[in-house]
Amino acid sequence: MRCLPVFIILLVLSASAPSVDARPKNEDDVSLASFHDNAQRTLQRLLNKRSCCPNNPACCH
């Protein structure tokens, strides 16, 4: 029973705390999807070079 008031206080404090979404977005915020797209593009480029280079070294530039 002694923990109940502490639990209630923590519950009220956590409910009144600002969420992460409350902070304003700025131009430095980049979505995770764009990072994923960049990673996919880089991986695809590396795979293309890997399959191309043994057959034609000129395409490895």
From Swiss-Prot:
| Any single Gene Ontology cellular-component annotation | extracellular region
Q: Where in the cell is it found?
A: Secreted
**UniProt note on tissues of expression:** Expressed by the venom duct.
InterPro entries assigned to the protein according to its UniProt record, in alphabetical order: T-conotoxin
Instruction: Write the signal peptide boundaries.
Output: 1-22
Name the domain of life.
Answer: Eukaryota
**Example GO molecular function:** toxin activity
Question: PTM per UniProt?
Answer: Contains 2 disulfide bonds that can be either 'C1-C3, C2-C4' or 'C1-C4, C2-C3', since these disulfide connectivities have been observed for conotoxins with cysteine framework V (for examples, see AC P0DQQ7 and AC P81755).
Q: Does the keyword Secreted apply?
A: yes
Query: Which controlled-vocabulary keywords does the entry list?
Result: Cleavage on pair of basic residues, Disulfide bond, Secreted, Signal, Toxin
Propeptide segments, given as residue ranges? 23-48
Domain comment as written in the entry: The cysteine framework is V (CC-CC).
Tell me the protein family, please. Belongs to the conotoxin T superfamily.
Q: What is this protein called?
A: Conotoxin Vn-05
